[in-house]
From Swiss-Prot:
The lineage of its organism: Bacteria, Bacillati, Mycoplasmatota, Mycoplasmoidales, Mycoplasmoidaceae. Residues 1-25 form the signal peptide. InterPro entries: Lipoprotein-assoc_dom, Mycoplasma_peptidase_DUF31, Uncharacterised_MG067. Keywords: Cell membrane, Lipoprotein, Membrane, Palmitate, Signal. It comes from Ureaplasma parvum serovar 3 (strain ATCC 700970). A lipid is attached at C26 (N-palmitoyl cysteine). Residues 143-237 form the Lipoprotein-associated type-17 domain. This is Membrane-associated lipoprotein. It is a lipid-anchor. Transmembrane segments: none annotated. GO terms for cellular component: plasma membrane. It is found in: Cell membrane.
């Protein structure tokens, strides 16, 4: 009897790319003929798996992981119909595929051998077809509820039929309890994995279905078998949204144009028109084909008004009226004489879908970033200047209860010293919605960082389990006092950073509704004074020995401790940050990378453009790059209290950058040494010819179901210039991530994730403004600079420079960013408003 070990089961998000409709509609009509011109082609084809077979279980392979054959004739269409494991040998994958030439279509099968042997620890898995007949009858009769039930440790008070498939999929690793109702003397059942039947959470949540990967033990002979059981009856909803309200992404294959080469050669405007047509069709279907007037009863515009708007919109690079209405954009409302009475907000955040361009050559469900890996020195440089920030507060309403807030923060600036000692007053940047947790109840903060020992192209472990990641905890040296104003000081935030209140642009009915609502950009700065901070704990891998660390660092003086925390930033002048002096809206050519290049230019084409680098510290709950059994020691710690370093790099680099001695790298340097670019996502894009550029007030004034409420209990509307970083959609905890270019120039700060589009919003530090020529009434994209100030639309003192000047007036303070003090704006950051 053939025996194989049971493979480890990958927890990486499942893969699915929808087969083009024309092929799918033909496969049911296929009949195998005695002789076909396609037979010879099929006999010469060699099919391959995308990744490393030796480390992959055949049963975990999805259809789109099979490579298109290189020697396929141009007039033949190849499509994978199904993949499944050989019953005889579970290290063999059988691929069922079709070939189509003209009106002729044929179906074939192909065996790909060499997948990882199937094992679970030291247990042997046998071919189920070789089991005795009595046992096979039992296996064929296994049914959930009838034969067995299960409960998840993560949801002890809920049955599985009260949980969405996505909830089960994301949380089963915390533990599964099996209750077996039948065949207790004959059979032992274990659930070792859950899979989405169609590869994505949307269809699973819509249908309430999952595939259970079962390990079955015959108690009579202790033989172990493997079975995949598709089960229904889980909680469902008509739209397939997950437990967080995330609407599943639109399958990117449905958005692809038929001729990609033709698309690549077109202008950005022509590409937008192609993409937008397909995107709107799907958006309309998701809204049950309702007219935009039904979806936006707040809008009022005649055919003539819309025609006039669309003509003007094209001249200033904006979306058409109807298209913008479906997307939930802010739009003008017209009076009977055609004049604009004001703008109307949609009052909700409209779902956003992914871009097929962002997913080219990739698994569309995994393009949200690269975990626990530094592909190159640029990312490492950013990592040395970036921290996971933990803020611990007393709960003012409950005794002995604490609230912890986590985000990402990074070095912005430091006060220079006159005695050449290492600086101890440092300025860190993060999001307003993170810094809002700093208040009079703040007891302590943690700064967690990757230490200098960390190397590129290696895979790190979870934050609390890695020897290279240290967590430093601080409280005020003034015992009995909380941290605010005793070692920790708030310097600046983006509340009401613009002169004009949002309500002033709105129609009368909304003026009243939003009269007390402010404007904001999600940015804040705080100061840490290491002279006033006491180090209370230090730890790295909490499974190891940490006692010596506290003793070691407690002997450091404030200068020495600041030097360790900041990785000697003050002495590394060449690595210190700068700011982008001209936004990508103002000069899009710097970031307008081609979608196709000549092969001879492969090593140089990208050097003409800016690249973007984003690195943050999200919690580990959405890090699906672990493997059961291989990573068991980490899986049980994959919680909100553990963090995964995350970048906007290529997910395909994961575990594939280590080069064996004498071997060739899996990816050429021209790929691994780069950063990334801006997303082509359509749902946010307000500047239609500039992918990745967004006016927040027009496209996303509200993020989620409600306006942002700050610590002052006031509500705020999102305003200003935003960017959409490509391939960056990490979990909570990454808020505050900096987006910078290859020159270490700060571009934006990341603050909102849109999982369904695998991108998010990053607030720009600088906007030169943009004149819409009356398209939106008296509203234009505002001019401002959050660091240097001086924008004509900016509230006085609402910049980091002016805030520092106000706080430290007459103190003759100088910093790295402002070596001559805070009175003057550097020439390159002055606005030309002549």
């Amino acid at each position: 009897m053939k025996k194989n070990k049971l493979t480890t089961l990958a927890l990486i998000l499942p893969i699915t790319i929808l087969t083009p409709i024309v092929i799918a509609s033909c496969t049911n009509k296929t009949k195998v003929k005695k002789s076909s011109s396609l037979d010879k082609i099929a006999s010469n084809l060699k099919l391959e798996y995308f990744n490393n077979k030796a480390n992959t279980k055949a049963s975990s392979v999805q259809k789109d992981e099979i490579k298109k054959p290189l020697n396929l004739p141009n007039d033949v269409v190849f499509s994978v119909k199904d993949v499944f494991v050989s019953h005889k040998d579970q290290s063999v994958l059988i691929v069922k595929y079709t070939l189509k030439k003209g009106n002729e279509i044929q179906e074939y099968t192909y065996e790909i051998k060499g997948f990882k042997s199937v094992y679970e620890k030291d247990k042997i898995v046998n071919d189920l077809s070789q089991a005795n007949e009595d046992f096979k009858k039992i296996v064929n009769n296994i049914r959930l509820k009838d034969t067995f039930d299960f409960k998840l440790a993560a949801f002890p008070n809920q049955n599985y039929d009260q949980l969405l498939p996505s909830q089960i999929y994301k949380n089963y690793y915390q533990g599964i309890e099996i209750q077996q109702h039948k065949y207790q003397n004959e059979l032992d059942i274990k659930i070792i994995n859950f899979l989405y039947p169609d590869g994505d959470f949307g269809s699973a949540n819509k249908n309430g279905t999952l595939k259970l990967s079962l390990m079955l033990t015959d108690k009579k002979n202790n033989q172990v078998y493997y079975k995949l059981l598709e089960v229904s009856g889980f909680k469902s909803n008509p739209y397939g949204v997950d437990e967080n309200g995330t609407i599943p992404g639109i399958g990117t294959e449905r958005l692809k144009p038929k001729n990609q080469d033709d698309y690549f050669s077109k202008t950005q405007l022509q590409r937008y028109e192609i993409d937008n047509e397909g995107y709107l069709q799907i958006l309309k279907r998701q809204n049950n084909d309702k007219n935009w007037k039904e979806l936006r009863p707040d809008l009022n515009a005649t055919v003539s008004d819309i025609k006039h708007f669309d003509e003007k919109a094209k001249n200033v690079g904006q979306d058409s009226y109807e298209s913008a209405a479906y997307k939930g954009f802010t739009l003008p409302v017209y009076e009977s004489d055609g004049k604009i009475s004001g703008l109307a907000l949609a009052g909700k955040d409209t779902p956003k879908g992914p871009s097929w361009v962002d997913a080219i050559g990739r698994n569309q469900w995994q393009i949200g970033g690269l975990p626990r890996t530094l592909p190159n020195e640029k990312y490492r440089q950013e990592a040395m200047q970036t921290f996971s920030l933990g803020i611990l507060n007393n709960d003012s309403h409950k005794n002995n209860t604490y609230n912890k807030t986590a985000g990402t923060t990074w070095i912005l600036d430091y006060q220079k010293t006159s005695d050449n000692k290492y600086p101890t007053k440092w300025y860190f940047a993060t999001n307003l919605h993170v810094a809002d947790a700093i208040n009079e109840n703040t007891l302590s903060i943690n700064l967690m960082r990757l230490m200098d020992s960390a190397q590129i192209k290696t895979t790190f472990r979870l934050s609390n389990l890695d020897e290279n990641i240290y967590n430093f905890g601080f409280r005020s040296k003034e015992h009995g006092k909380n941290l605010l104003n005793h070692g920790l000081k708030k310097i600046f935030d983006g509340r009401d950073f613009l002169k004009t209140k949002p309500a002033e642009y709105l129609i009368n009915s909304q003026k009243e509704k939003y009269k007390d609502v402010g404007n904001f950009t999600d940015f804040a700065v705080f100061e840490l004074d290491f002279e006033k901070l006491e180090l209370v704990n230090v730890w790295k891998n909490f499974l190891g020995e940490n006692n010596g660390l506290v003793t070691k660092y407690n002997n450091y003086n404030p200068q020495e401790l600041a030097k360790v925390i900041t990785s000697n930033y003050a002495n590394n002048k060449n690595n210190q940050i700068k700011f982008l002096s001209k936004s990508y809206l103002s000069d899009y050519s710097k970031i307008d990378v081609p979608l196709k290049y000549r092969q001879e230019d492969a090593k140089t084409w990208f050097k003409k453009y800016d690249e973007l680098f984003a690195l943050g510290w999200p919690n580990s709950t959405e890090d699906f790059f672990f493997k059961a059994y291989v990573d068991d020691d980490q899986l049980k710690y994959r919680t909100r209290d553990n963090f995964s370093l995350w970048t906007n790099s290529d997910y395909r680099f994961f575990n594939n950058l280590t080069q064996q001695e004498g071997g060739q790298p899996a990816f050429p340097p021209e790929r691994t040494e780069r950063g990334n670019y801006l997303s082509y996502a359509i749902g946010f894009r307000s500047f239609i010819q500039k992918p990745g550029i967004v006016d927040a007030f027009i496209a996303v004034p509200q993020i989620g179901n409600n306006l942002y409420t700050s610590s002052d209990n006031k509500k705020y509307i999102n305003m200003g210039l935003e960017y959409l970083p490509k391939h960056f959609a990490p979990a909570g905890g990454a808020s505050g991530t900096s987006v910078r270019n290859q020159k270490n120039e700060l571009v934006a700060i990341y603050h909102a994730k849109y999982d369904s589009s695998k991108t998010g919003l990053a607030a720009a530090f600088r906007s030169e403004g943009y004149d819409y020529q009356g398209l939106y009434g008296n509203y234009n994209l505002p001019q401002y600079d959050l660091i240097y100030g001086g924008g004509k639309d900016q509230t006085e003192k609402k910049s980091y420079r002016e805030a520092m000047k106000d706080i430290y007036q007459n103190n003759n303070i100088k910093t790295a960013l402002f070596p001559d003090g805070f009175d003057k704006i550097p020439d390159e950051f002055k606005f030309n408003n002549n």
